[in-house]
């Protein structure tokens, strides 16, 4: 007996503090602390920030955290960070989607903003319009300041069913310092309330891809068909053992 996965959602993960990454793929804790300090300075320069998905509990007298306006991608202190994000996308996401020769293609954060989630603050369910992939990078997080929750909006069952981890409507991530998640922009997601006395720092971003053809910026061949004639259509088919678990 076998099971086939239909229409999976692809979420890519890396931790930029991983010591196994080379210098062009990650960074050290000292740089992470530098980013946190810069976010604090950004807040001093713009204490109001903006309210988009960031919210506060209606039953508690808490602030809604703080979200900057766009612009991290043009901040000199964030350039190393932005380069690492682009490299991650080039290394992992593009090859997975069949783009093995990315020469002439330039990945960058089209817009990026900083977040400080304080006690009681959370982010309402939302998607990111106008891009292919979005992401979040955690600059300072211990894992207990509110989970990142992705929600499956594709109805798979319309009646009663046995509860099991394989039939669930959401996936929960407990972010730690250095974690980065890249996800399709249409993935519905939210951030649970922070019930600790700590503040979590992160930056969110929307990825933009451009082709550079004859030194002219444009979408170029990004819209072309990258289908692989040798693609294995059975890659998401798994045989099951006697307990119903996939054999990998």
Q: Where would I find each of the regions flagged by the language model?
A:
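Short aromatic/hydrophobic contact patches that present stacked aromatics
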Residues: 13, 136, 204
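Catalytic core of non-heme Fe(II) oxygenases with the double-stranded beta-helix
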Residues: 108-182, 192, 209-221
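Double-stranded beta-helix
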Residues: 149, 207-248
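Non-heme Fe(II)/2-oxoglutarate
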Residues: 1-101, 122, 221-226, 230, ...
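Ligand-binding loop in jelly-roll beta-barrel domains
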Residues: 188-202
């Amino acid at each position: 007996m076998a099971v086939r996965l239909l229409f999976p959602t692809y979420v890519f993960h890396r931790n930029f503090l991983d010591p196994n990454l080379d210098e062009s793929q990650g960074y050290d804790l000292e740089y992470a602390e530098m980013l946190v300090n810069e976010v604090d300075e950004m807040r001093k320069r713009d204490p109001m920030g903006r309210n988009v998905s960031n919210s506060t509990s209606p039953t508690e007298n808490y602030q809604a955290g703080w979200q900057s306006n766009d612009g991290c991608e043009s901040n000199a202190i964030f350039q190393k960070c932005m380069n690492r994000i682009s490299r991650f996308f080039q290394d992992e996401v593009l090859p997975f989607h069949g783009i093995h020769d990315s020469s002439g293609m330039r990945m960058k954060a089209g817009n990026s903003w900083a977040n400080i989630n304080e006690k009681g603050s959370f982010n309402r369910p939302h998607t990111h319009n106008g891009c292919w992939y979005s992401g979040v990078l955690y600059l300072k997080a211990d894992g207990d300041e509110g989970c990142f929750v992705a929600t499956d909006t594709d109805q798979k069952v319309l009646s009663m069913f046995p509860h099991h981890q394989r039939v669930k409507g959401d996936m929960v991530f407990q972010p730690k310092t250095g974690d980065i998640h890249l996800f399709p922009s249409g993935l519905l997601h939210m951030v649970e309330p922070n019930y600790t006395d700590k503040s979590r720092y992160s930056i969110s971003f929307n990825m933009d891809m451009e082709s550079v053809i004859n030194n002219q910026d444009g979408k170029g061949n990004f819209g072309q068909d990258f289908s692989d004639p040798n693609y294995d259509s059975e890659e998401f088919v798994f045989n099951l053992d006697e307990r119903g678990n996939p054999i990998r």
